[in-house]
C-alpha cells in the first residue's frame, strides 16, 4: 500500500526536517506533499529545494483545514513549534467533526537533536497519534517522564537522525576544508561567540594549507526559530578586525560543503549527523566544556570531543577517533532507525493493529500543554463559550489566557466584557471589544 | 565518623543543616563550613571560611569525608584547589561526596549534576534522579559514577505535629522570579485577591519561598509580596507570611499552593492537601516538568471553593516515592557507603 502523507511546517528548521523526511518516505515508495505555512523571512533556498523535490503547497492552517484535498492523505505530519502543534491537533479534530470527515492519524516529531526542554516539548506533543523520536536516548527520557502518569499509552516511534541519503563513494579527494556549523544561540553570550571565532582564527593561522569556512545558520536578512541581535558576520568583524585569509564565511548549501570538505566542527548542531551522512569527519568543540546550556552533554559519549585550542593544527585534528558506534545507536544514528519505522507504524494504525483511540488528555490532577492550553486555543474556546452565552466559562478560559499573555490588551478587554454582570452593558462591551480573529 | 559539610547559598546551607542533624542522630560528628555570606547572615553553627582557603585547608585532613554542596563554578574551584593542595602536601584528597541540594529534574538536574560528576560518591534523592543520572552518563567515562539515593534529605520532610491553624489557611508559595515579569505577577496577584474575596472564611497567606530582604522596599517587583504592598485595598483575609522562613507558614497551613516551588514537596510528604498551579502549563523555566506527574496540578479557578481542596489534592504516592519519599534510611545509607569508601 502506497501511503500518501502531508507534512505541515512553517519555520526554516522545521521545513528542513520535512524535506529530509519527505525524501526518505519517497525513497521508500510513499507519496509526500509538503505544506509550508507562509512566514516572512523563510529562506528562499529552503522553499526552492522543497519545490524541486515534490509537491509544495503554501496555505495558512485555516485554508489548509478547509481544503477538500486533505481527505486524500493517509496521515498528516505536523512540524510546528509547541503551542502551534497543540493548536493544529485541536483545530484539525474540530474541523473534521464539523465537516463529518474521518480523522486521519496525526504525527509529529523533532527537527533535529533535542538538547533542552524535552519535557516541555513532549507536553505540547501529547495526544498526537504518533510522536517520532530520534533514538533510544529520547525514548528513555520519554519513558521517564510518562512513568507513573495517565499518559503512558502515548505512542511513539523511533525514526532516527539520518537525514540524507548516504553519499556515493567519490574517487575525488576531499579538499582541506574545515566547515564550522554555526548555531545562533550556542553559545549565546557575545563574549563566548567572540571567543569561538577567535579560536577558529587561531586554528586557521596554525593551518595555512587549510581553509576554515564558517557556515552561518541563516543569512543576515533571514530568520530562524531563535531571534538574535548579532549575526555571526558582525561577530567576526568585532572579534577579529581582519581575519586570516583562510578563514571565511560561506553561504554555500551545507550538503554541498560537506560533500567536498574533510572536516566539520560544531558545538552541538544536528549538522554533525549530516556530516556523517556525507562522509565528512565531524568533531565536537570541547573548549567550552560539557554545559547543559550549550547542549554539549548530548555528545559526551560520542568520542568526537576535541579542543580546538589544544589542537596543533587541522591535520592533527583530522587524525582523531571515529564516532563511538554504541553512542550512535543510543542517539538514533543507526540503520535500525529510519522513516521506514514511521511508515510501518502508520500502516499498523490504519490496519487497526493497535487501539487507535486518541490519548485522553484530561485527567484530574494533571495538566498538559497540549490540552487546549495555547493562548489562541483558550481564546477560541472563550469565543465559543460566548456564542453559547456561557459567560462564566468564557471568563475562566480568558483568565487562563491572560495569565499566559498578561500584556495582551485584547484579552484583558474581552475578559472585562464577559465579566460585566449587566446584560445590556455586557452585550455592548462584547460588541466593541475584539474577539479572536480567525 | 567525622564529616564536614560545605555549602554556600541559602538552600545549600539549609539542606546541609538538615543532613547534619540526621547524621548526628546516627552518631556522626559533623562540622558545617562555608564562606560567610555577610555579617548579618552570619550563623553561629557555621565555621566561616573563604572558599579557596577552605579548599586548601589542613582542617579537612582531620575529617573522614567532605560533603561539598556548592553550586557549579564554586564546586569546580573547590575540587581543583583541594586536589592541588593535597598533591602539594603529598597526601590524597579527602573523599568527597556531593549532589543536588534541591529536588531537581530534567534540564536543571543535568546542569546541576555535570560539575559534580567524578566525586567519590554522588548523593541523589530518589529512584527518579538515579534513572536520570544513568540516562545522562550512558556510554560516557562517568558511566560507573558511584551514587546512592538518600531520600528527600534537602527539605524538612520529617513528620510534624498537629499545629495547623484554627482558621482555615491557604498558603500560596511566592517565588520571587516566577512568573518573570512584574506585570504577569500583578495579574496573578489580582487572581489570588479574587480567590481570597470568594473565600471570606479562609485566610490566604502569600508566603515567600526564599528569604527576602527585611526592607520591603528592596523586594523584587516580580514577587507577589511586592504587589501586595502596592495594593491600595487588598482583601482583609489576604496577608503576607514571614519574609525569612517559609516553614512555619507551611506547618500552619490547611492547604498549600504554588507554581513550581521546591517547598511544595514538604506539605505533600506531610499529607497536606497541595495544589500545583497548572495555569502556566509545563514550562521548564517554571519547574513544571518536576511536578508533571504529581497528580495535584489544577488551574486556579478550579480551586474554588477552597473547602473542596481539603478532601482532595493529595499527590500520587508512586510519584512521591519515585522522587525519594520512600527512602527512610537515607543517612544510614550515606554512612554505609562512606565507610566502604574510606575502607
Model-inferred region functions:
Chain A
Residues 6-28, 35-152, 158, 401-410, ...:
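Active-site and donor-binding regions of nucleotide-sugar-utilizing enzymes
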Residues 17, 163-235:
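Conserved catalytic-core segment of nucleotide-activated headgroup transferases in glycan assembly
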Residues 229-251:
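Nucleotide-activated donor-binding/catalytic signature segment of Leloir-type glycosyltransferases, i.e.
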Residues 250-295:
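A donor-sugar binding/catalytic signature common to diverse glycosyltransferases
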Residues 299-374, 380:
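Leloir-type glycosyltransferase catalytic cores
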Residues 374, 386-387:
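Hydrophobic/aromatic side-chain positions at a characteristic register within alpha-helices
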Amino acid at each position: 500500500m502506497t501511503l500518501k502523507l502531508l507534512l505541515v511546517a512553517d519555520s526554516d528548521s522545521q521545513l528542513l526536517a520535512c524535506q529530509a523526511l519527505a525524501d526518505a518516505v519517497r525513497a521508500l515508495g510513499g507519496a509526500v506533499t509538503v505544506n509550508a505555512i507562509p512566514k516572512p523571512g523563510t529562506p528562499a533556498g529552503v522553499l526552492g529545494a522543497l519545490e524541486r523535490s515534490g509537491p509544495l503547497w503554501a496555505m495558512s492552517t485555516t485554508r489548509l483545514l478547509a481544503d477538500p484535498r486533505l481527505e486524500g492523505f493517509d496521515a498528516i505530519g505536523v512540524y510546528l513549534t509547541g503551542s502551534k502543534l497543540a493548536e493544529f491537533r485541536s483545530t484539525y479534530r474540530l474541523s473534521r467533526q464539523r465537516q463529518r470527515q474521518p480523522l486521519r492519524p496525526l504525527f509529529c516529531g523533532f527537527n533535529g537533536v533535542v538538547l533542552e526542554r524535552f519535557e516541555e516539548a513532549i507536553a505540547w506533543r501529547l495526544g498526537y497519534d504518533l510522536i517520532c523520536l530520534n533514538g533510544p536516548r529520547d525514548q528513555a527520557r520519554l519513558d521517564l517522564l510518562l512513568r507513573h502518569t495517565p499518559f503512558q499509552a502515548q505512542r511513539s516511534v523511533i525514526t532516527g537522525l539520518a537525514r540524507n541519503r548516504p553519499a556515493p563513494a567519490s574517487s575525488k579527494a576531499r579538499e582541506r576544508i574545515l566547515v564550522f556549523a554555526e548555531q545562533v544561540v550556542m553559545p549565546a553570550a557575545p563574549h563566548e561567540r567572540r571567543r569561538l571565532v577567535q579560536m577558529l582564527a587561531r586554528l586557521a593561522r596554525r593551518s595555512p594549507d587549510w581553509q576554515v569556512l564558517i557556515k552561518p545558520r541563516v543569512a543576515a536578512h533571514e530568520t530562524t526559530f531563535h531571534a538574535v541581535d548579532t549575526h555571526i558576520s558582525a561577530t567576526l568583524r568585532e572579534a577579529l578586525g581582519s581575519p586570516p585569509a583562510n578563514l571565511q564565511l560561506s553561504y554555500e548549501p551545507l550538503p554541498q560543503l560537506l560533500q567536498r570538505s574533510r572536516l566539520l566542527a560544531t558545538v552541538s548542531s544536528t549538522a554533525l549527523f549530516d556530516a556523517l551522512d556525507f562522509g565528512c569527519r565531524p568533531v565536537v568543540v570541547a573548549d567550552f566544556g560539557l554545559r547543559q546550556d550549550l547542549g554539549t552533554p548530548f555528545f559526551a559519549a560520542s568520542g568526537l570531543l576535541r579542543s580546538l585550542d589544544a589542537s596543533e593544527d587541522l591535520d592533527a585534528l583530522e587524525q582523531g577517533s571515529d564516532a563511538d558506534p554504541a553512542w550512535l545507536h543510543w542517539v538514533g544514528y543507526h540503520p535500525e532507525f529510519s522513516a521506514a519505522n514511521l511508515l510501518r507504524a502508520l500502516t499498523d494504525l490504519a490496519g487497526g493493529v493497535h487501539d487507535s483511540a486518541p490519548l485522553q488528555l484530561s485527567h484530574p490532577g494533571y495538566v498538559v500543554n497540549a490540552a487546549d492550553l495555547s493562548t489562541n486555543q483558550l481564546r477560541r474556546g472563550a469565543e465559543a463559550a460566548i456564542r453559547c452565552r456561557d459567560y462564566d466559562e468564557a471568563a475562566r478560559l480568558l483568565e487562563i489566557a491572560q495569565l499566559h499573555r498578561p500584556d495582551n490588551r485584547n484579552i484583558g478587554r474581552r475578559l472585562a466584557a464577559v465579566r460585566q454582570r449587566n446584560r445590556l452593558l455586557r452585550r455592548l462591551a462584547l460588541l466593541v471589544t475584539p474577539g479572536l480573529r480567525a | 565518623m567525622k564529616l564536614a559539610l560545605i555549602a554556600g547559598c541559602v538552600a545549600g546551607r539549609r539542606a546541609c543543616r538538615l543532613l547534619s542533624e540526621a547524621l548526628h542522630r546516627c552518631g556522626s560528628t559533623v562540622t558545617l563550613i562555608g564562606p560567610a555570606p555577610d555579617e548579618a547572615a552570619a550563623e553561629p553553627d557555621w565555621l566561616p571560611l573563604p572558599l579557596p582557603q577552605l579548599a586548601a585547608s589542613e582542617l579537612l585532613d582531620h575529617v573522614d569525608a567532605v560533603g561539598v554542596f556548592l553550586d557549579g563554578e564554586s564546586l569546580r574551584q573547590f575540587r581543583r584547589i583541594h586536589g592541588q593542595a593535597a598533591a602539594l602536601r603529598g597526601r590524597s584528597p579527602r573523599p568527597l561526596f556531593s549532589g543536588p541540594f534541591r529536588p531537581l529534574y530534567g534540564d536543571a538536574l543535568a546542569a546541576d549534576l555535570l560539575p559534580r560528576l567524578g566525586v567519590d560518591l554522588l548523593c541523589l534523592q530518589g529512584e527518579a534522579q538515579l534513572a536520570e543520572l544513568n540516562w545522562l552518563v550512558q556510554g560516557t567515562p562517568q558511566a560507573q559514577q558511584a551514587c546512592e539515593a538518600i531520600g528527600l534529605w534537602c527539605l524538612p520532610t520529617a513528620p510534624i505535629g498537629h499545629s495547623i491553624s484554627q482558621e482555615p489557611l491557604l498558603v500560596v508559595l511566592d517565588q520571587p522570579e516566577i512568573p518573570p515579569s512584574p506585570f504577569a505577577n500583578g495579574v496573578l496577584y489580582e487572581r489570588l485577591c479574587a480567590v481570597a474575596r470568594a473565600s471570606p472564611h479562609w485566610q490566604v497567606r502569600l508566603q515567600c519561598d526564599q528569604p527576602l530582604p527585611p526592607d520591603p522596599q528592596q523586594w523584587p517587583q516580580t514577587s507577589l509580596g511586592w504587589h501586595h504592598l502596592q495594593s491600595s485595598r487588598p482583601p482583609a483575609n489576604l496577608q503576607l507570611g514571614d519574609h525569612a522562613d517559609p516553614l512555619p507558614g507551611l506547618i500552619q497551613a490547611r492547604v498549600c499552593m504554588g507554581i513550581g516551588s521546591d517547598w511544595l514537596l514538604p506539605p505533600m510528604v506531610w499529607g497536606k492537601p497541595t495544589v500545583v498551579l497548572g495555569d502556566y502549563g509545563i514550562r521548564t523555566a517554571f519547574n513544571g516538568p518536576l511536578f508533571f506527574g504529581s497528580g495535584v496540578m489544577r488551574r486556579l479557578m478550579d480551586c474554588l471553593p477552597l473547602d473542596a481542596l481539603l478532601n482532595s489534592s493529595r499527590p500520587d504516592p508512586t510519584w512521591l516515592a519515585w522522587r525519594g519519599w520512600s527512602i527512610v534510611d537515607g543517612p544510614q545509607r550515606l554512612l554505609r557507603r562512606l565507610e566502604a569508601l574510606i575502607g
